[in-house]
A protein has these predicted regions:
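Structural alpha/beta core scaffold segments of enzyme domains
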Residues: 1-191
Length: 191
C-alpha cells in the first residue's frame, strides 16, 4: 500500500456532516444555555504555572474546564499605590508553539484486538485512555509507544490518535496520519 493508493481510496470516501450548534467566542460559550463545547466530566489541569497557585472550587459552569487563580502580593495596596490604572478588555492571539514536526501517529491493529499506537504526543497515558474510550476497549488493550518528539511545549496532546485508531480498526490495517504544517494550524491546535 502506498500514499497514492491512500489518495485514491480517500477520493471514494463519502462524508456526511451534521451541523452542530456553535459557541465561537468566550462570551457565547459562557452564556446561559450555550451549546456544550466540552465533555463536562473533563476537567482541565495544569493551567496555572507559578509559585502562588490557588485552585478554585470544582462547581464550574458547563463550558468551564478549570479555574485557577494566581496571587502574589497585596492587590488592594497595589491599586492604592498605583500612579496609573488601566482597565480594558484584552484579546490575545492564537499561539503556535512551533515544534519541529507536526502532529503525527501510526496505529497498528493486532489480531488479538489490541492496538499499538505510535504517537508524537506529550500525553501518552491520556492518549491511551482516550483511544480506549473512543473505541470501547479496555485501557490494557491499547499500547502507546512514544518515540522522541521534536518538541511540543504543551500543544501535543490527544487530537488525532482516536481518529487514526478508529480507521485502523475499521480497515484492519495499520493507519498513519501526519499533518502538514498548514493542517496542524487549521486543526485548531495548539492554543
Amino acid at each position: 500500500q502506498s500514499e497514492a493508493a491512500a489518495t485514491d481510496g480517500a477520493a471514494l470516501v463519502e462524508v456526511t456532516y451534521e451541523p452542530l450548534p456553535v459557541a465561537s467566542t468566550t462570551g457565547a460559550a459562557l452564556a446561559p444555555g450555550a451549546p456544550l463545547v466540552r465533555n463536562p466530566q473533563e476537567l482541565g489541569g495544569g493551567g496555572g504555572h507559578g509559585a502562588a497557585v490557588q485552585s478554585g472550587p470544582r462547581n464550574l459552569p458547563p463550558n468551564v474546564s478549570n479555574r485557577t487563580s494566581l496571587k502574589q502580593g497585596d492587590i488592594a495596596r497595589g491599586f492604592e499605590e498605583a500612579e496609573v490604572i488601566v482597565e480594558d478588555v484584552f484579546h490575545l492571539p492564537m499561539v503556535y508553539q512551533g515544534y519541529l514536526e507536526p502532529m503525527a501517529c501510526t496505529v497498528v491493529p493486532e489480531v488479538s484486538g489490541h492496538l499499538t499506537v505510535y504517537a508524537s504526543t506529550q500525553t501518552m497515558f491520556d492518549t491511551r485512555r482516550e483511544v480506549a474510550q473512543a473505541l470501547g476497549l479496555k485501557v490494557s488493550q491499547v499500547k502507546v509507544v512514544l518515540p522522541f518528539i521534536g518538541g511540543g511545549f504543551g500543544a501535543k496532546a490527544v487530537l488525532l490518535e482516536p481518529l487514526c485508531a478508529a480507521l485502523a480498526v475499521m480497515t484492519g490495517s495499520p493507519v498513519h496520519l501526519s499533518f502538514s504544517r498548514m493542517e496542524d494550524l487549521a486543526a485548531g491546535n495548539p492554543m
